């Protein structure tokens, strides 16, 4: 048995106690890391960083110093890269290729296949054509030859392609795209971007217009009610209770108590009016406190008793009436003061206790929210910083690749300019005048997606006026040979689309075109993402248009 030091034991205990305090922060960091992992899942694994580029440049300098040809080394590297890409493409084709059995005796489910699939689909599967989800076969930009009759679907696919390229290349911090369904507008085909300020302004203007158009609520005015003793009575007022006891000498005690106790001397009509008014004004009256209701009940009982006592005294001795009035008034005033003070004290104490409980609950909630916010701020900021640094690294890598490629092209042009050498200074000036910055060579232009697409498009589509507009817009992206888009950027844009937009044939063709010809994203990765979003089988029936 080995003894554990006391410091290690204390560290273990404190770490166990601190686990439950930061459980919420761990959940937030896990969510942020999951988001970043989803975005960086489809990023190229072998990222050439600055250190590798510097090592490569030093190696090239050493090789040139030894005596090896600089351009020969570059050609060998390019040939090796192309060979590796070709081998990878062949492997993917072999994996996706349909390989039927050679002998019919080995096929056990041949009859089932013939019953479920038609002959054309079997021929296409045997030929090695991969059936993509939601993509049409005949009128498709991915097809090797496009028919001249299908102009409308090709125009819609070109509009969706421009919208997708625009969404992939804009700065999302200041700009945003208009809805995808607006890209098929013949006045503005392909859609356009807009600033966030302008969109918010349009929303506020629309809300104001809707508020202006909607009819205002009509106020229902009630007819003025007939004022009676019961309708004008409000028990919460202090003056009504004071008038209960302080009566003038000339007025009788019965008339002074009629404002509280409903008398039997009133006619039946006044009672009906009183009931109607009380029922109509019941929801408008303020809700009385419990102690005030008890106080009113006590006052009413006292008033009834005094009326009974005074009626008996009037029968027996009318001379004692004035004395009884004074005694009763003084006694009632003192009793009302004591009950009012006690009710006020009890109501204030109960209200203070209730307010203290509410304040304690609100403080605990505020403290809990502050703790959650503070624990989540670090994880959110870390995730944002990681995503920004990742994007900056990708931009740097793309720029370095473009600069290296253009530097190689300029070096070749300079090398070929020294055909006949005469004088060093003359040759240098001749090279500087002749060499111009040319973007791309003949092979790169021939293999580019834009020029390949233009060669496939039918003449009817090129003469179609809305199609001319969309082709002019696509020219901006097509002539940019240095366009680089990462797979995670495509998935981030597609995440904001709705399911019916992803399943639309025209939009699906545009997504497939961008994935295969521009981004070069593996098909398996895209299908896995699409299945997690749309929940469809791997092989879906195509739409014949």
Swiss-Prot record:
Residues 238-259 have a biased composition (Low complexity). The keyword ATP-binding does not apply. Keywords: Coiled coil. Residues 72-99 form a coiled coil. Residues 224-284 are annotated as: Disordered. It holds the Pfam family DUF4698. This is Coiled-coil domain-containing protein 60. It comes from Mus musculus (Mouse).
